[in-house]
Amino acid sequence: MDVEKKIELIKKKPTEELLTEENLRHLFEVGIPMQHYIGFEISGYIHLGTGLMAGAKIADLQKAGIKTRIFLADWHSWINDKLGGDLETIQKVALTYFKEGMKQSIKVMGGDPDKVEFVLASEILEKGDYWQTVIDISKNVTLARMMRSITIMGRQMGESIDFAKLIYPAMQVADIFYQGVTIAHAGMDQRKAHVIAIEVAQKLKYHPLEWKGEKLKPVALHHHLLLGLQEPPVWPIESEEQFKELKTQMKMSKSKPYSAVFIHDSPEEIRQKLRKAFCPAREVRYNPVLDWAEYIIFREEPTEFTIHRPAKFGGDVTYTTSEELKRDFAEGKLHPLDLKNAVAEYLIELLKPVREYFEKHPEPLELMREVKITR
């Protein structure tokens, strides 16, 4: 596969931002072995925004011939008070429920879970020279910048935090360089850490990204954050700035179960959640159900998506692109309930292999049900 085809695969949905395409092309051209990574806190049930969005992108990267890695961020989860801040519980969940759930998610999105390397953060954090990299990065970033970056943990600027949380952004950047990562992958909410990585790349003395004597910058790949199903706190949305802010605030959240569909939800749970979803008639700009359709159902276009309706309501209708679907919805030709029902049935079918896996192997999910879920 030539470089341009690889770049097209990397850019396809659900990619929302690539920092930068020019640098990605340069990395391919210099011939450095390409290593992807995406890091996850271990914090609760896996929802579609985690499993399917990351799984879809991992599938694309594999098709482009890139080695893929999932970094199970146990220490980072401990710092950020996940699962009650109990490191032993976090590690147990990471290596059972989370690992198996991500494998199944990758599989349903067309990737090969056996080609994904899973690394527990403890395995590298316990090496002394990792902390040299953390200090090296920290010496090249101001305290004010680190404090602004705590939003990568789902924390607000100005929120009262313990000191450990200020180390977190430097650790996240160190993870990239210590593992020799060329493509750092995350949701759009992790952008601040990745921008720091790009900016400090050529200043580092310990574990820089280097190939044949040249210090290189990693590429940052950010996928779309699926909107949560709940109604936003402010409606209607007046300004573009408000809209951008809301998109990040209203992402799917495991701490708000009705905002999210989890990868192992039952068919009835999926139907109930979609029925309750915020989906105002004719609204296409901020509509979680249309958002899910665009990034899950219409990830590959053209694709056939049929909405079944009684003849008296217009009968069945088939769409091949998300734009066709949005157009009919905006014009009032498609009722919100018909859209919700069709998306629910699509997800039920898509997630069937995941449900079947956890029915045959219930132990990881049972363990997860026993532990405290935090945001």
Curated annotation (Swiss-Prot):
SUPFAM superfamilies: Nucleotidylyl transferase. It is an enzyme of class 6 (ligase). It holds the Pfam family tRNA-synt_1b. Keywords: Aminoacyl-tRNA synthetase, ATP-binding, Cytoplasm, Ligase, Nucleotide-binding, Protein biosynthesis. InterPro entries: aa-tRNA-synth_Ic (IPR002305), Rossmann-like_a/b/a_fold (IPR014729), Tyr-tRNA-ligase_4 (IPR023678), Tyr-tRNA-ligase_arc/euk-type (IPR023617), Tyr-tRNA_synthase (IPR050489). The keyword Cytoplasm applies. L-tyrosine binds at residues 37, 168, 172, 175, 190. Catalyzes the attachment of tyrosine to tRNA(Tyr) in a two-step reaction: tyrosine is first activated by ATP to form Tyr-AMP and then transferred to the acceptor end of tRNA(Tyr). HAMAP family: Tyr_tRNA_synth_type4 (MF_02009). Belongs to the class-I aminoacyl-tRNA synthetase family. TyrS type 4 subfamily. This is Tyrosine--tRNA ligase. It comes from Thermococcus gammatolerans (strain DSM 15229 / JCM 11827 / EJ3).
